[in-house]
Curated annotation (Swiss-Prot):
It comes from Caenorhabditis elegans. Its EC number is 2.7.8.27. The lineage of its organism: Eukaryota, Metazoa, Ecdysozoa, Nematoda, Chromadorea. This is Putative phosphatidylcholine:ceramide cholinephosphotransferase 3. It is an enzyme of class 2 (transferase). The keyword Cytoplasm does not apply.
Amino acid sequence: MGSVSKTVISARGASPDDEQNGTKNGISNGSEWAKCIFLFFFLFIAGMSNWAVLAYTHDYVPRESLPDIVFSLVSEQRWASSLGDFCVALCIVMLGALLVIHQHRGTILKRVVFCAGTLYAMRSVTLAATQLPSGYTDNQGRCRDQVESEAGVFFGRLFEQTIRIGFQSKDQMLCGDLLFSGHTLVMVTCSLAVAYYLPKSIKPLQWVSHVACLIGMICMTISRTHYTIDVVIAYWLSNMVFRMYHAYCEVDMCMERRKSILYSWWPCRIVDWLEQDIVPGRLENRCQLPWRRSTPRGQERGGASAESSDSSVTMCDNITTSHHQKHVSISSSSTYPLPC
């Protein structure tokens, strides 16, 4: 067993002693802090870019709404806008509760933040590329007046959006924040995370977030906060980003990850860096309140080291741990798992 583990590490370009001595606590902590700082600024800049585009394009967006299949079937329901916001808040609360009770809350938070940042970065590009008019029946009354572009007006709007975290007054708002739906990407990402990471004993609670997400998407359309296409694209992209990230994480060996077609997609290079200290494979979904110390049972699958002071850092190079053992044979062409 020991010789196989050493062979695997040597194949990754490290000495056999790296399994025990290669990662010191200081280096690991520094790496984790670097990842946290990167993710914070990534999400912050992605969000700010959305608000900056809205602050600028509001004065150029037409006021005549476009045809939409749902708009032709259902009249504008203004009450649904508030219900949609409530559904967004409920999905966020569900995710927050999951982070409180889950043993690997730090790993989950990093993954969700990266997915959200990626989606908001995509959204800022679509907002800047194509400006759609709002779908309200009375766009002139619901949207703020259009003025000549000035730096003072732009930065004032940007500051307002920043302190409100993107939320706006329902009566006088900046218009053109449409393609694609930010409400939907938040709800879908949160509900996917809740469903994926909930421990089995409380798995049925995932339906709370799923139902809230479905109702919220319907409300976004019938309230004419978004066109149907905004919601559909947001749903597709949110699923794609979340599932591609986790499909990459579930590739059960680091060397196989590098051979995967996913690795050729440049965001997966960042994912590879974010996941380098986490044992490949699916997280073990287990409850553990943050104020309770974990028992010294060894390292758990999926990076328990980030959440427990009683275990050492689990690196991607370390193929064998007490709860996640891999028996592998390395040839010049590929790797093959052997039965344990």
